[in-house]
Amino acid sequence: MTGSSDIDLLVVVVEKWSNLRVGVTWIEGRMGDLLFATTSEVESISDADLALDANEWVRRVAAFLASTRILVDQGGRLVRAQRAAQQWPDAAFAPTRSDAYRAWHKINYDRQHNRRMLASDDSDYVTALDVRLLYGLNDVLTGYFAIRRERWEGEKAAVRNLREHDPAFLELLRRCLAEQDRHAKFTLYEQLCQEATAPAGGLWANQPTSAHLRDPGTATPEAHAAATAFVQSLVRGK
C-alpha cells in the first residue's frame, strides 16, 4: 500500500439493507470504497448449485473474496465463502461472450457517430464530440478487456496489466489522452478502437449501415455482416 492508496472493504449486511451496493467514506485519512453483500448472497457463493447461477453482483463479490484478507467473520461465513470462491473457475469471473460482443458493438457504434460529428462545422457538435471522446476513451479501455474476456479490476490495475502485456496500446492511449489537437486526437482514438476490437473482428467497414444482433451467442462476424446487409437492403428498398 502506498501513500495514495485507497482501502477496499466488503461489508456483509442483513437482508434489511439488501438495496445497498457501494459506498464511499474515509478511514484514517484514506478513501474507503465499500462493497455491500447480504448474508444470503455470501452464503450462495458456498453453495455449488447456486454458484452456477450467480448473478453479476454475486460474481463480483466472489471475485473480491477470493483474494482478500478477512478481518471480521462472525460464524465463519466469509471463510467458507472465500474457500468456495477460490475453487471457482477463472471463467466464472471473466466477462461473458455477451459482454465481449456488446463492447465490440459499442466501440464501433460510437466511432461511427464520432466520425460524423468530427466532419461537422457546428460548434455544438464539435463540443459534444470533445465530451464524447472523454468517456469514449474509457469505453475503449474497458472494452479492450471485455473483448479479450479479461476481468475489469479498475483503471490502476488496467494500466499495470497493459504495461506488462501490451505496452504499445498503453503508449497509444497515453498519447491520445495528452493530445490537444482534435483531429490528431481522433486519429489516435481510431487506432485505439482498431487495436481494442481486433480479437473480435476489428472495426466496421466505413459504411453507413450496421446491425446489432439480439443473441450474442450467434453474433459471429459472418452473422453480423449478413444482418447488416439485410438492414441495408431495407434502406435501399431492395
List where the protein language model places each region.
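Short secondary-structure boundary segments
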Residues: 1-3, 9-13, 19, 77-95, ...
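Catalytic metal-binding acidic patch
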Residues: 1-39
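Short aromatic-enriched loop/helix-cap "lid" or pocket-rim segments at secondary-structure transitions
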Residues: 2-3, 46-48, 157-158
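Short secondary-structure boundary micro-motifs
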Residues: 6-10, 19, 54, 128, ...
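Conserved NTP/Mg2+-binding pocket subregion across the NTase superfamily
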Residues: 23, 27-123
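Conserved nucleotidyltransferase catalytic core and NTase-mimicking acidic/glycine-rich helix/loop elements
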Residues: 89-238
